[in-house]
């Protein structure tokens, strides 16, 4: 019995990114159903996106693990489903103010990043250096860039790292996003041999995982007022400007491709990715990843908005004009 319990605890720690991924899904669903006033039951169903990722990973693992790990995976999946059902049918609403929700989000985002840091460090100090070095810097540029370009604002938080306009919580959130997404992708690569040989395929999986996470997260954040979108952005999905989801995909794909290309080319484990030489490579390629992200983003929005005169470019033009520049 002791041996089995020790094995289960090791599985819990090993699968902390997956458990964290599901915990975030439950937390978002809880806020949507119980804490928003009035409740946004129309958004509750979005838990299917992170749950689908979990189900796909459990299915991919099925042939590669023993009976205990299969039971563990099934328990995680069914347990999460039971909690979600219980919250919808049995839990009583407990409305919270915007300030209370914001405070809870801010604390949980920073605590989550700290937990991620401990998990990464226990796996490898070099892996922690990768996520709290270049990954953190890349995320900070993304978050602050969106604000500086005029697409959204993030006000009312208690902790800012001046002179950056983005709060510490949302910048730290990118560390969590990339760590969870990359950890899930590495698990998929272990189970699917052809994926382990394809950096592009793996980057697409990472992007899909990130979008499944954001399809649930951003509708809540928008409804709760965690960030405020520019009023010109009228093309929406799940109550969120379509631009947001395109931005996530455009940000995650090139950066994850850069990391996964290094791993595939060198045939190394994730724990070795943060070695000194690879860290230098990643730091040097951040500008290239940002450029690729910008090209993907603006090209995609031009397609969705039918040209370069849509809301995305109107916001950009207004912002540049405020900075004393112009597109034409």
Q: Could you tell me what each predicted segment is?
A:
Residues 2-328:
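Aromatic-rich, lipid-facing transmembrane alpha helices and their immediate juxtamembrane interface loops
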